[in-house]
Curated annotation (Swiss-Prot):
Protein name from the UniProt record: Non-heme chloroperoxidase
Protein family: Belongs to the AB hydrolase superfamily. Bacterial non-heme haloperoxidase / perhydrolase family.
Highest taxon, organism lineage: Bacteria
Keyword vocabulary terms for this entry: Chloride, Oxidoreductase, Peroxidase
Lineage of the species this protein comes from: Bacteria, Pseudomonadati, Pseudomonadota, Gammaproteobacteria, Pseudomonadales
Positions of the catalytic residues: 95, 225, 254
Description of how the protein assembles with itself and partners: Homodimer.
Domain AB hydrolase-1: 22-254
Keyword S-adenosyl-L-methionine: no
Molecular function per GO: chloride peroxidase activity
Record flagged with keyword Transport: no
Catalytic activity, EC: 1.11.1.-
PANTHER family listed in its UniProt record: HYDROLASE, ALPHA/BETA FOLD FAMILY PROTEIN (PTHR43433), NON-HEME CHLOROPEROXIDASE (PTHR43433:SF3)
Organism: Pseudomonas fluorescens
One Pfam match: Abhydrolase_1
Length: 274
């Protein structure tokens, strides 16, 4: 396995395919780099170098007790980019990974970044507050935590067979393969790491990070996203990132990297080339 070690001694697994302009992918919760394989295979075949890492505590990376927070995730990404000495990189983040990309730019700037993309991403803020009335109430995230402690294997099955891919919608055609794929990745994450990450993706406010993004940015979101509702996320983020492009996928669920992979791949390629 290909890994590098962060300054705090955490081993981070990553895959690095192809050659050309580097495209870096940050994955969602509780998944890992494998969740981006459709996009990676497609873009590598188009002449790009594609890189994706397993966030600390997820997949094949180390499972440290501490450091399961967005600042550390962003710093891990920065160290990966520095380790590989990437320049002119395009950063794509899905769901929690979109927060990681935003926080990376907020903390480390865009000296090594050419463009960015937020896909079904959690910014600006998932949690409902007085300043963010369109967010989700704390009870939603407390429920996820409780379900994780009670039977996280079943939680991942329920998420994947229900709202994540939109399989709970009338007329939806479920895929047992997608459900198994989500579950397999989720169960590879450390339980403590995945548990802590719920707080990281739900309570981190990325508003100021988004305002610091000064490179061309693509925001992609499904208008049927039941996990990260579009109004308080994709639409709000696009309004905060100066000059961003918002693409709304009609009827698309949260997990559109799988359900709408061909459409997304084409849009990512056009954005990179544009």
């Amino acid at each position: 396995m290909t890994t590098f070690t962060t300054r705090d001694g955490t081993q981070i697994y990553y895959k690095d395919w192809g050659s050309g302009q580097p495209i870096v992918f940050s994955h969602g919760w509780p998944l890992n780099a494998d969740s981006w394989e459709s996009q990676m295979i497609f873009l590598a075949a188009q002449g790009y170098r594609v890189i994706a890492h397993d966030r600390r505590g997820h997949g094949r990376s180390s499972q440290p007790w501490s450091g399961n927070d967005m600042d550390t995730y962003a710093d891990d990404l920065a160290q990966l980019i520095e380790h590989l000495d990437l320049r002119d990189a395009v950063l794509f983040g899905f769901s929690t990974g979109g927060g990681e990309v935003a926080r990376y730019i907020g903390r480390h700037g865009t000296a090594r970044v050419a463009k960015a993309g937020l896909i079904s991403a959690v910014p600006p803020l998932m949690l409902k507050t007085e300043a963010n009335p369109g967010g989700l109430p704390m009870e939603v995230f407390d429920g996820i935590r409780q379900a994780s402690l009670a039977d996280r294997s079943q939680l991942y099955k329920d998420l994947a067979s229900g709202p994540f891919f939109g399989f709970n919608q009338p007329g939806a055609k479920s895929s047992a393969g997608m459900v198994d794929w989500f579950w397999l990745q989720g169960m590879a994450a450390g339980h403590k790491n995945a548990y802590d990450c719920i707080k990281a993706f739900s309570e981190t406010d990325f508003t100021e990070d988004l305002k610091k993004i000064d490179v061309p940015t693509l925001v992609v979101h499904g208008d049927a996203d039941q996990v990260v509702p579009i109004e308080a996320s994709g639409i709000a983020s696009a309004a905060l990132v100066k000059g961003s492009t918002l693409k709304i996928y009609s009827g698309a669920p949260h997990g559109l990297t799988d359900t709408h992979k061909d459409q997304l791949n084409a849009d990512l390629l056009a954005f990179i080339k544009g």
